């Protein structure tokens, strides 16, 4: 299984309940498509290098996972692009 890290930035004005629901939803998208989540944690609220959608700060969330194929990653990528609460995301394959 290949190891991946996903970092995504959530809009800073989201309510805590909505943020937890968003994280749970995207974690379940990964697991329902065959990935195994090793760790999913909030990093911190950070100032952005440049303004994104009129926001100067964002809530960073990191997910470490293992996957045998790209199905889960492609579905995460597709859904995070159309979700208004996620400002940016990045998927990186880690060295084994």
Curated annotation (Swiss-Prot):
InterPro entries in the cross-refs: Ribosomal_bS6 (IPR000529), Ribosomal_bS6_sf (IPR035980), Ribosomal_S6_plastid/chlpt (IPR020814), Transl_elong_EF1B/ribsomal_bS6 (IPR014717)
Q: Which residues form the signal peptide?
A: none
Question: Which GO biological process entries does UniProt record here?
Answer: translation
Query: What GO cellular component entries does it have?
Result: cytoplasm; ribonucleoprotein complex; ribosome
- Which GO molecular function entries does the Swiss-Prot or TrEMBL record give? small ribosomal subunit rRNA binding; structural constituent of ribosome
The reply on keyword Aminoacyl-tRNA synthetase is no
Q: Which Pfam families match?
A: Ribosomal_S6
Q: Please verify whether the record's keywords include Ribosomal protein.
A: yes
UniProt entry keywords in alphabetical sequence: Ribonucleoprotein, Ribosomal protein, RNA-binding, rRNA-binding
Q: Which HAMAP family match?
A: Ribosomal_bS6
Q: What function does the entry list?
A: Binds together with bS18 to 16S ribosomal RNA.
Record's PANTHER family? MITOCHONDRIAL 28S RIBOSOMAL PROTEIN S6, SMALL RIBOSOMAL SUBUNIT PROTEIN BS6M
Family stated for the protein in its record: Belongs to the bacterial ribosomal protein bS6 family.
Protein's name in the database: Small ribosomal subunit protein bS6
Q: Which gene encodes it?
A: rpsF
């Amino acid at each position: 299984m290949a190891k991946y890290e996903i970092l995504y930035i959530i809009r800073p004005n989201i309510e805590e309940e909505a943020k937890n629901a968003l994280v749970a939803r995207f974690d379940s998208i990964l697991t329902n498509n065959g990935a195994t989540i090793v760790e999913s944690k909030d990093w911190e609220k950070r100032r952005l290098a440049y303004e994104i959608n009129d926001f100067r700060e964002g809530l960073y969330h990191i997910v470490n996972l293992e996957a045998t194929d790209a199905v889960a990653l492609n579905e995460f990528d597709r859904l995070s692009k159309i979700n208004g609460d996620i400002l940016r995301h990045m998927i990186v394959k880690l060295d084994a």
